[in-house]
């Protein structure tokens, strides 16, 4: 495995260079702006390329050392792409609504996840002893919890890295990451504050094609990290004095 390749042409075709209308910009984005055309800011892709490459390396390195990456994107055009890419790379996601305290109050979130598991147990069984109305209420509760927490139910703790689409919309998530010292990789459009992000990637955060490209590249970087982790485990096993029983390796890059 290797880090995913991408080209300037791919970025252009996906519309990564199109920012917002010039009057909507955040002046802190000035270093990343190439110019403007028809009152639309044009993002400098010559800076996007190395910063995106750096972010992909960070994702791969995090996963290679056993870390967890949380994909966050709740806007309509990002929601499905965020979930699909996280599942494909055996990572975690929030794609419906960021609940306040999702990271900073993990204990309460863990209790809700336990409730979700319990509801699964009840409803996947015979669910005897419940009236039709009671069962319907349980199904609605499970559906609500699964929508909010389904993407993090198996995370087992706070993540080691967060990947975020739309830093303005997901400001609460970024604030919580900062409080806990969780590094953030994020797309920064012309109306964003780059100072909030550890690993900024200048680019359009609204176009579906651009979001699809980011999600695909981040997912493939995570899959590369899984391959590196498994390869390192294999080397460690081979270096052992006594040859252990060979463990069954689970393919972490398969699609969920």
From Swiss-Prot:
GO terms for molecular function: structural constituent of ribosome. The gene is rpsB. One of its GO terms (biological process) is translation. HAMAP family: Ribosomal_uS2_B. It holds the Pfam family Ribosomal_S2. One of its GO terms (cellular component) is cytosolic small ribosomal subunit. This is Small ribosomal subunit protein uS2. Belongs to the universal ribosomal protein uS2 family. NCBIfam families: rpsB_bact. The keyword Cytoplasm does not apply. InterPro entries: Ribosomal_uS2, Ribosomal_uS2_bac/mit/plastid, Ribosomal_uS2_CS, Ribosomal_uS2_flav_dom_sf. The lineage of its organism: Bacteria, Pseudomonadati, Pseudomonadota, Alphaproteobacteria, Hyphomicrobiales. Keywords: Ribonucleoprotein, Ribosomal protein.
């Amino acid at each position: 495995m290797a880090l995913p390749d991408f080209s300037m042409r791919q970025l252009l075709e996906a519309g990564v260079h199109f920012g917002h209308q010039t009057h909507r910009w955040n002046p802190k984005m000035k270093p990343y702006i190439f110019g403007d055309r028809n009152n639309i800011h044009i993002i400098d892709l010559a800076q996007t390329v190395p910063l995106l490459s750096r972010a992909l390396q960070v994702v791969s390195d995090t996963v290679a050392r056993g870390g967890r990456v949380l994909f966050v994107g709740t806007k309509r055009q990002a929601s499905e792409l965020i979930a699909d890419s996280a599942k494909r790379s055996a990572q975690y996601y929030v794609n419906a609504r960021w609940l306040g305290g999702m990271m900073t109050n993990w204990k309460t979130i863990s209790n809700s996840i336990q409730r979700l598991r319990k509801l699964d147990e009840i409803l996947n069984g015979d669910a005897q002893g419940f009236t039709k109305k009671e069962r319907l209420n349980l199904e609605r509760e499970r559906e609500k919890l699964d929508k909010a927490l389904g993407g993090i139910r198996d995370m087992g703790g706070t993540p080691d890295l967060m990947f975020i689409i739309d830093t303005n919309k997901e400001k609460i998530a970024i604030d919580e990451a900062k409080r806990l010292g969780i590094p953030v990789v994020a797309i920064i459009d012309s109306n964003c504050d780059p100072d909030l992000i550890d690993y900024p990637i200048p680019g359009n955060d609204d176009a579906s094609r651009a979001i699809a490209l980011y999600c695909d590249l981040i997912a493939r970087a995570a899959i590369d990290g899984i391959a590196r982790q498994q390869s390192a485990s294999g080397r460690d096993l081979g270096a052992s004095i006594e040859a252990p029983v060979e463990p069954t390796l689970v393919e972490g890059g398969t699609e969920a």
